[in-house]
Amino acid sequence: MLNDHRASSACKNAELLRATAGSRGLSRRDVLRFGALLSAGTALTACASTGSSNPASGSSAASAGRIFRFAQGAAPVQLDPALSPVASTYQVTAQVLQTLLTADHYTGSPDTTDSLCREWKVSDDRLTHTFVLRDNVHFSNGTALTAAAVVQNFQRWQALATGESTAALVVPAQPLYAWGFGVPEQPAQKDASADASATPSATASPTAGASASATADTQSSASPSEDPNSSGSQKGATAKTEATKPEPKPVSFTPLVTSVKEQDGAVVVTLSRPSLAFGCILTQQAFGIIDPALFGSDQKLTSVPVGTGAFRIESSEKGTVRLLPNEHFDGARPQLDEIQISTLTSSDKRYFALVEGMIDACDQVNSSDLGQLARDGYQTPGRDPFSLVYLHLNTAHPVLKNISVRRAISHAVDRGALHQYYPQGTSDAQTLVSPSFRIQADHAKEHTDRNQDLSRSLLATAGYNNQVIECYYPADVSLPWMDTPQKVYSEMVASLIEVGLNIVPVPLTWEEYHAKVNEPSSTRGIALAGFYGMYRDPYAFFGPALAPMIAEQQVRSIVAAAPESMTTGVTAKTVELPSSNGADSNIRIQATPSPQPSFSPAPASPEESASASASPSPTPTPSATAVPVEESPSFLQIMESIRAADSAESVDAQRELYARVVTQLGQFMPAVPLLNVTSKVAVSRSVQGYQTEQNAIEFFSKLRLS
């Protein structure tokens, strides 16, 4: 039967090719698209049901039950949402796991609707959060949900966020347990001298209830009397020649979450300070509650996650995850008999799989296809641009440690050239936070406006001399925030080459990219990155952009606390960790210049990297001269401002305080904002009730098939 279906599909595809080629021949795009159709058909044959004569109606699959088939552009890195906090994983686990709180569809505010709680109570001092669980809730394996099980989930998140091998992966749990978001146990030490205002950074506790100390990076800061919202004009001293600064004394920190316990059948969470973000953070799929029986000794899952949601995972193989209804679900039974979530990394493959009736809906529709899909009766709902595409700049890199180089990159990028690869509604990003938060950033453009002459002068100030900077980006994948990574990379890097930067592309598989993009490293230079905001709070944007620096500090705290006798792993006392020391200053670049030219076009795949053609990069113009460098706050000061904003008593007060953070991040420049992007979904007419979400993670349990 399966072979018959494949043969039928092949014949149909061949007829379509002949019909199209008959009168006008095939363009290159046609050839690519029909090739995509053939490969998509092969990938989906195993799970495709009988096609309908009307593609826009989808294939009803009456004989096989009500099966909803969805294609996304990236495979789940793994099905553990805590260790794989990416949209492709969340899209699967959102159908399986439930969280303590959910986000209101319209406002994003944390709520108990469709959550595991029937009540959420916050004490007057905002330090104690009590979660009263619903009665008679069971995991899909029949095990009852208890407060003790929820406590074990919190303990797991803590262990992963503070573990040496997982700290860089568990980005959503960083504000709960890792470095910088809790409360410092001693004030930052300030140098009283007039010409040095270094402040030590800090790390979070390895355990939820205890403080920890870590050696942090010495970082010069802006004068305390300086208005943080003042003009961003280039001022201050030119490049310094010293290579390093002395490490300061350790600073102890208490994490945000200090205790989680069961009390009278409820879960009680105690915080070290008030936090406006805390409830919002818990709405993420990373905090979906999983049966603790699956937690291994290393806190990693021993099998696919088992949750309390409307569906359970039946299988996951060959890029397709099959979900079946959870017989123990206590809510309204879904009107679907099965969900199939497959991976098609090309928008052409997804488009033709949709019009051929192989799938019922797909993510990330190519802008050029929207008109035809609408004319053919497909639904094409869009998502708000609650997202960010950016360049992460590794402050532990020997070149990017220099603040003038990071600022030069910000002034070099041509954001306007990137719009051609995104749907209408995409806009330039001037800051690292979504405009929807309405945070005033009066001087933001001074840090991000394109100015090639200033960029070249800043490189001269830093002493840049053609040193190589590697740029990581994901290859052979399609993401909600970047449908065509290779094209976006090539367009972006061209503007960096124009000002004289020597950029070498490092295309990575999706799995490699996810593992390396946040890990402490002095090798990674730039990473082309992005995300959709996963919860309705500004830290949903600041957190991912700062995650690599937070991970570095967290690993540093683990090393500081490790016994002298340990000789393996990153806990070895002799290990040399990458350091962001001096990342807020203009310490002159010490790295050896490279005779190699810069790579202009990106290779099509990691395998082609070695044979990628190179083109000489323009050198900085001879007239480029050093310029005064504006002072920057330290990373510790930025985190201090973030904590102050998050502790505010109201959203309005928070907004004003976060304006300071936006300015500080513009000065420090740990990442270069590029775009706030939107994306589209294509859905056949047979699907009813499809509702897009601001965070690009949709729920399928309430869908209906006609």
Q: What do these predicted ranges mean?
A:
Residues 427-462, 468, 476-487:
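Structural transition elements
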Residues 460-534:
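Ligand/substrate-recognition segments at binding pockets and active sites
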Residues 71-124, 306:
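N-terminal lobe/hinge region of extracytoplasmic solute-binding protein
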Residues 294-296, 319-322, 327-372:
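Ligand-site clamp/hinge motif
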Residues 105-107, 193, 197-255, 264-266, ...:
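Gly/Pro-rich hinge or "lid" segments in bacterial periplasmic/extracellular proteins
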Residues 119-176, 180, 268:
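Aromatic- and charge-enriched surface segment that lines or borders ligand/interaction sites
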Residues 17-42, 46:
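N-terminal secretory signal peptides and thylakoid transit peptides that target proteins
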